[in-house]
Amino acid sequence: MSRVCQVTGKRPAVGNNRSHALNATRRRFLPNLHTHRFWVESENRFVTLRLTAKGMRIIDKKGIDAVLAEIRARGEKI
């Protein structure tokens, strides 16, 4: 399963570790992903999403129905 947030689309980024001597070694910055079940009242069922902490805050703000509509408009199957 890919490390991508289903709400924000955030995915791993690449950069450098920097030592005290400023030596650079490549690394990946991974998103803060969680698998979370949300109760969708309109569909009378649970929906499981893989999303970041920011994605959870967006759902708290907009509501699960609005966010699911946006995800489905992108063509993602839920």
UniProtKB/Swiss-Prot annotation:
A GO CC term assigned to this protein in UniProt: cytosolic large ribosomal subunit
GO biological process, one term: translation
Keyword entries, A-Z: Ribonucleoprotein, Ribosomal protein
Keyword Protein transport: no
Pfam family, one: Ribosomal_L28
Residue ranges of the region described as Disordered: 1-20
This protein's record includes keyword Amino-acid biosynthesis: no
GO MF, one annotated term: structural constituent of ribosome
Highest taxon, organism lineage: Bacteria
Family: Belongs to the bacterial ribosomal protein bL28 family.
Name assigned to this protein: Large ribosomal subunit protein bL28
Organism of origin: Actinobacillus pleuropneumoniae serotype 5b (strain L20)
